[in-house]
Structure formats: C-alpha cells, structure tokens
A protein has these predicted regions:
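Conserved post-catalytic alpha-helical subdomain immediately downstream of the catalytic base
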Residues: 111, 115, 141-203
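Conserved structural-core and active-site-/substrate-pathway-adjacent residues in large, well-folded domains
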Residues: 28-31, 83, 126, 153, ...
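Conserved N-terminal subdomain of the carbohydrate kinase-like
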Residues: 1-30, 190-211
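Conserved phosphate/ATP/ADP-binding segment of small-molecule kinases
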Residues: 33-135
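Active-site donor-nucleotide binding/catalytic segment of nucleotide-sugar enzymes
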Residues: 30-33, 226
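Hydrophobic residues at beta-strand termini and immediately following loops
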Residues: 138
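Short gly/ser/thr-rich secondary-structure transition/capping motifs
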Residues: 11-12, 60-66, 214-215
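Positively charged, low-complexity intrinsically disordered leader regions
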Residues: 209-225
Length: 226
C-alpha cells in the first residue's frame, strides 16, 4: 500500500470515469483516507477538485471527510466532517469553548471555501457550523460505547443520504448523530439496519411509540440483538 499522489495515467483514467459514475447520483462523498487518490498532484491537478466541479455542473451536493492538512482540495464542497483531532490539527483550536470552536470553524470554512463544517466530537456529540445561522450543538446519542470503528463513516454516509433526500443540514446532522449512536454500541465495524435507524431517528424526534404490538416488539428486539 502506498500514499503517493496518482500517476498521470491513473489520474486521467479516474477523471474520465466521472461522467458515467455520476449518472443518477443524488449526492457524492469524498471519503479521504490520505492514501493518495485525492492528493494534489505535482502539476496542481487534483481528483477531489475534479469530482467537486463535475458535481457542481450537475447540481449534486458533495460532502468530504477530510484527511491531512490540505483542506483546500475540498473547495466547493457543501460540507466537511472532521473529528476533533483533525479539526484541532488544521485550525489550531482544541475546542475548549463553544465560542472558540465557532470562531475557528468559521475562519477555516472561509479559508477553504466550504460553507459548513460538521465537527464530530466523540462522547460530546457533534457541532454544526454554517456560514449563515447559529451553530448547532448536538448531544451524543450513545449510552454505552463498545467500539467506535466506523462511526465517522456512518456519519458522512447518513449525512449525504439525508441531503440527497432534501433534508436540511440541521436535520441531517441529527439523523447522522442518531445513526452513529447505534454504531458505537456494536463490536467491530457493523452497519445500522433500516429498522434500527428509523427507531433511533423517531426516538430522537420524540415520535418513537411507547406502546407497540407484538410484531413491532419482535422487530425491535431483533435489532437490539444484532
């Protein structure tokens, strides 16, 4: 495994594949693991920017889970979703106060030309900062943390799915928080089922039923056992 930027042939092949890959796409995710595919090349070209430009031409929202320190690669995306360590490394803000986080997040968004940032804060939940509007701080959902593997991937996947359905970022962030709360209760990298997700979102919104019939109870218990 290497983490070098793409060679010219690799870059051109991936770039040429974008139009077909984006057919029927309602949202796009740049899940950057710092392995090289989304790195800026020596000539300044960058597949991340090409994806964002192609999506902009088609009206497709792009969300990025950032890595390393060159977040300018995500310029034009709708949102970046760093964790606390990634945010602190790039912004210089360790998150001691909400005011400090907001100031640092807004400055960072202006610098990288991205209108919003969803900060995942582990046991402290999430914080959504948008260029227009007040910050939104969301408490963590998990009562018991078993394994945090896959939580970040779950957050951006649910966030993108919600945006593809037309939800606001505030509502999408709450849905992502609910889903992440389900994931960290499971051992290993485990998915969230549709039933689990709907139950978590309804509970978060106060609409989860307190009285259920036997089939509903069986379905819920099956989710808990997974």
């Amino acid at each position: 495994e290497t983490s070098r930027p793409l060679e010219a042939e690799e870059y051109e092949r991936l770039k040429a594949a974008l139009p077909e890959a984006l057919e029927g796409c309602a949202a796009a995710v740049l899940s950057d693991y710092g392995k090289g595919v989304l790195l800026r090349r020596a000539d300044g070209s960058c597949l991340a920017g090409d994806v964002i430009a192609a999506c902009a031409d088609r009206g497709i929202p792009v969300l990025a889970d950032p890595k390393l320190d060159d977040w300018g690669r995500y310029a034009g995306a709708e949102c970046v979703t760093p964790n606390s360590a990634e945010f602190a490394a790039v912004s210089g803000c360790a998150g001691e106060t909400r005011e400090g986080m907001e100031e640092a997040a807004r400055a960072l968004c202006r610098h990288i030309a991205v209108p919003r940032l969803l900060l995942t804060r582990g046991a402290r939940g999430m914080a959504l900062f948008e260029e227009d509007g007040d910050p939104l701080f969301i408490k963590a959902e998990a009562r018991q943390v078993v394994d945090v593997s896959g939580a970040g991937d779950t957050v951006i996947a649910v966030l993108a799915a919600c945006r593809a359905c037309g939800l606001s970022y505030a509502r999408a962030a709450r849905c992502a928080n609910a889903a992440a709360g389900m994931v960290v209760r499971k051992a290993g990298t485990s998915p969230v089922s549709r039933e689990e997700f709907l139950y978590a979102v309804r509970r978060d919104g106060g609409s989860a039923p307190k009285i259920m019939d036997l089939p509903q109870l069986r379905e819920l218990v099956a989710c808990w056992r997974q």
